[in-house]
Amino acid sequence: MMQFTSSYFRQVLLALCVAFALSSCVISRENVIVLERQGSFTAGGTVISTPGTFDSIADGAFSPADQSTAGQTLHGDHAFVFYQIPVDARPLPLVFWHGYGQSMKTWQTTPDGREGFQNIFLRQRYPVYLLDQPRRGQAGRSTEPTTISAATNDQLWFGIFRLGVGSELYPGVQFSPEPAALDQFYRQMTPDTGPLNIELNTKAVSALFDTIGPGILVTHSHSGGMGWLTALKNDNIMAIASYEPGSGFVFPEGEVPEPIPYVRGALRASAVSLEEFRRLTEIPIVIYYGDNIPNQPVENPGQDQWRASLTMAKAWRDVVNRRGGDVTLVHLPEVGLTGNTHFPMSDLNNLAVAELLSNWLKEKGLD
């Protein structure tokens, strides 16, 4: 009869462990995103200086209470860019620009822990560039001072971002009911570290496209209007996909619509020359809006301001298209996607939202 020693059992156990580990690796590799390269850089920016002479001996020690700035410079007001290039990448990258009070976190892991647009489109072999605009997030080095408020305003943004009213989620909303998800959502808000400067922001993002070449700009909310202005500056922007642009719509001189009133405010458009405006007729553009946006004025300001934005966006689409442009506006409930907040890219149905964009890119020959 064969005798089994403890050494024999150890060898068998080791072999089984190795086999299990290898099989696990094979299974998990199906979900691996393989990158050719990744990295980061800054784009745009300014340099300011203080007159005088810097004395590296007398003034070379860090002394916050009595620090001389004479003869020194400050590099700031740039965008910060993080990029990932997948293996066998598609030719045109997607450049993702966040909205007001946000950073590149908008496009990364969702508040409830699922993959965001960053990974979703990497899996589709698109090069992905995420940016923090000047004076925001990782681009916080500002050449102008500001005061950062510590106001308690979470519930204000809960309503404006159309998660619900007060602290109650809308019925059927595409946001996780788990308290931890809402906690994560609130914590992705981030302040401006300097005065908001539209021209500064658009120059920085234009410089980004100067660096990377042709690509597709994907904007959200406040960056929507800045996206149109950036396209006026840079022919490397081959298309724009805009999620819930809230303001900053530009029309040809003489065709600016009347302001659209909403609760406690009014949405105004601005004018550019017809020559500048024609640039927006030369590229395909798609605009997406989510749910819980009324057709008529309502008392809820968190909904009513988006009614004004959607109304203005429709007028803008019509003006661009009348001049030979190619603007598509998609109201998600009208195509069967209900419950979306102001953040469709991180909502529970973000895979379906991403599929709409993927299909549009293919339809326009941008894939």
Regions found by a protein language model. Name each.
Residues 27-89:
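N-terminal cap/lid segment of alpha/beta-hydrolase-fold proteins
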Residues 91-99:
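Short beta-strand element of the alpha/beta-hydrolase
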Residues 98-110:
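Active-site glycine-rich loops that stabilize anionic/oxyanionic intermediates
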Residues 114-140:
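Conserved alpha/beta-hydrolase
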Residues 218-227:
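Gly/Ala-rich beta-loop-alpha elbow adjacent to hydrolase catalytic centers
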Residues 247-324, 328-330:
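The feature captures the conserved acid-bearing segment of alpha/beta-hydrolase catalytic domains
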Residues 339, 343-367:
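Catalytic active-site module of serine/aspartate enzymes centered on a nucleophile-bearing elbow/loop
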